[in-house]
């Protein structure tokens, strides 16, 4: 079972295209040893949005001689893709057939009282003394995957304490991530903020009939 922590920098929120990609290949779930790493830049076919420029500081003119964004592929042995809000990065690279492990969902489940669950906020929560240095290059893809690995270590410690034993393997971590992604509170609509378990049955039925309903909200409503 092969797992990669992956992060991307993109052209922005509107039909995003890849401009920078980074990954860490993890040797095992026990100590999260890094067996190899990658960082590369890619040329998009559209202009980078100002909001993305302000985040990544990657300029269009720096990418002129880079390979096309369409040429990027994860290594062939990829089975598990790990990331903070991993679905975004997974979507940018074309929705490949990998099992996705979301550190953001696991963070929300493990530390529900935190006022923010961004990766940077989680680094401050768990590595307060080192956080300023660790986050100096936040939103640079390679720094982000390295920080995600640090967060993943704390997630595994917290899960081990909760389970009474270490997480067995990537497959179990994926199952725990899938469970964490199923919400307990509705975050939209007229019942925003209500426990899903307490929603009126007719409203639940109406939501389940919506074709574009988030699949994890659908799971929560179907319980």
For each feature predicted by the language model, list its residue ranges.
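Acidic, Mg2+-coordinating catalytic module of metal-dependent nucleases/exonucleases
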Residues: 80-87, 91-93, 121-188
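Eukaryotic low-complexity, mixed-charge intrinsically disordered interaction/regulatory segments enriched
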Residues: 183-201
């Amino acid at each position: 079972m092969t797992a990669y922590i992956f992060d991307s920098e993109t052209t922005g929120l509107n039909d995003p295209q890849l401009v920078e990609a980074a990954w860490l290949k993890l040797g095992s779930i026990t100590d999260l040893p890094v067996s190899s790493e990658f960082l590369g830049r890619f040329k998009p076919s559209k202009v980078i949005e100002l909001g993305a420029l302000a985040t990544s500081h990657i300029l269009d003119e720096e990418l002129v001689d880079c390979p096309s964004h369409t040429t990027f592929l994860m290594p062939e042995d990829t089975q598990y893709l790990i990331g903070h809000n991993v679905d975004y990065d997974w979507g940018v690279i074309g929705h490949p057939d990998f099992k996705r492990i979301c550190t953001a969902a696991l963070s929300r489940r493990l530390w529900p009282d935190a006022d923010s669950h961004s990766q940077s906020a989680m680094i401050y929560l768990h590595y307060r003394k080192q956080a300023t240095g660790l986050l100096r290059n936040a939103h640079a893809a390679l720094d982000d995957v390295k920080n995600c690995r640090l967060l993943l270590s704390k997630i595994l410690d917290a899960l081990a304490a909760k389970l009474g034993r270490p997480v067995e393997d990537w497959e179990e971590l994926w199952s725990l991530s899938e469970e964490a992604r199923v919400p307990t509170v509705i975050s939209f609509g007229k019942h925003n903020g209500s426990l899903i378990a307490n929603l009126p049955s007719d409203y639940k039925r109406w939501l389940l009939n919506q074709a574009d309903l988030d699949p994890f909200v659908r799971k929560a409503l179907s319980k």
